[in-house]
Amino acid sequence: MVKAPRGYRNRTRRLLRKPVREKGSIPRLSTYLREYRVGDKVAIIINPSFPDWGMPHRRFHGLTGTVVGKRGEAYEVEVYLGRKRKTLFVPPVHLKPLSTAAERRGS
């Protein structure tokens, strides 16, 4: 038996699959241009249409984190993986807003 290769996207067949109605559709322009501020809570949801644009590893799909800063076009997002704190550089295409810092302050 030959050992199975362990590439970066292995075991992602179901994880990186779009629903049937979304296949072939282009995301809204606001998805690319969305601005986040430091302290905003975001969810890391991988968009499989953009594999070459800073796609995070599959272990981070579905995790929530806090925006810590911006680096180039990507955002620095701090997430916890178990007890360990990780800093990821994720473009806005793979992020979804949960709440903003202003909403939590009540203004």
Swiss-Prot record:
SUPFAM superfamilies: Translation proteins SH3-like domain. Keywords: Ribonucleoprotein, Ribosomal protein. GO terms for biological process: translation. One of its GO terms (cellular component) is ribosome. Coiled coil: none annotated. PROSITE patterns: RIBOSOMAL_L21E. The keyword Aminoacyl-tRNA synthetase does not apply. Belongs to the eukaryotic ribosomal protein eL21 family. This is Large ribosomal subunit protein eL21. It comes from Aeropyrum pernix (strain ATCC 700893 / DSM 11879 / JCM 9820 / NBRC 100138 / K1). The gene is rpl21e.
